[in-house]
Amino acid sequence: GDSFLEKSPSDYITSGDLQEVAKWNSNILMGQALGTYSTTFAMNSGGTGGHDDFGQKSVDIATDLMSGDMVIMSQGYGWFEAAGSLTCTTTTAVNYSYQFWRYYYKLIKATNEILDAAGGDEVTPEGEENQIYYAQAKALRAHSYFNLVNLYARPYAEDKTALAIPVYRTQLTSEAVKKSSVEDVYTLIVKDLTDAIPLLEGFKRPSGAKDQIDQSVAKGILAYVYLTMGDYKNAAKLSQEVIDSKQYTLMNKTEIINSGFASVSIPGWMWAIDLTTSNSPALPTFWGHMDLFTYSYAYAGGEKLIDTELYNSIPASDARKKWFSEYNSKGEQYELTNWWKF
């Protein structure tokens, strides 16, 4: 008899479904790509539901705290405190290992689905628009694997033969794969980005928007990768290409103090999301945790301060020292919080 089980359920879409739809609707890659970018700033993208789980910037805050260059002024709220106390890598009782893993593999799954719909990650699709979203998927997948291999494996320069993380290049199979070596992960990262860069030639984002990856952003990501691999020549070459394109301008010492880095319209910003009340909540955001003038955690005792030794190592002639300098009417310096950086 007939089965009551749906062969193609309507409550989610598979890579196979995307492949079929893409044959007659070229906009499917665009829709999937734009939806994937929203994961980079979505609350609970790491699956914990906490106020320190909101995509890429939550990873950035946690890893800055783990570096020791930034500290939390006082504890009590709980958010980011395991990172601030440097205990998140010594116990499984905190969510960070799960959160970061889940966040990046969620992005990898989404980018793989785009690549599957385009015919696979070894075949460049036809059509300029499809090539753009194919290239963006490759660049975002590379960015995700780059962060994963840095978080969960040995440094490339220290032991590139060490086992690192599982590498998935398609969602057309659910079969689990074994860990790849650090070197193999980096090989895929470099390939994805070098495949993406020429396909993004001439791509212009909608006016005022910087959420999508363009060619300069892809080059910037690859420059970071080369730096981590110790390939300083190629890192410098790519960085110079971005500067020479004049698509983005280097900020002067006045702009870095007065701008507050608060707007995506700042010419120096290459890749950014404009957070608004319509696309993000108030408390669990980058601003809520980092901006002293936002009525949230940073305002109410959870300030993030620069480490004293790092602050003291900044020459007085360096304008960036003013980010962390504020004095009261008696000439006494307040705590080293980021008064004028955001």
Segments the model singles out, each with a brief description of its role:
Residues 74-152, 198-202:
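Conserved, well-structured interaction surfaces
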Residues 236-342:
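Hydrophobic-face positions in mid-chain alpha helices that act as interaction patches
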Residues 151-183, 187:
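Short coil/linker segments at helix-helix boundaries
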Residues 130, 182, 210-211:
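Short coil/turn linker motifs that delimit alpha-helical repeat modules in TPR/alpha-solenoid proteins
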Residues 11-17, 56-59, 154-161, 202-284:
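Short, surface-exposed recognition loops and adjoining beta-strand edges that mediate ligand/DNA contacts
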Residues 1-60, 239, 301, 310, ...:
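Membrane-proximal, proline-rich intrinsically disordered regions
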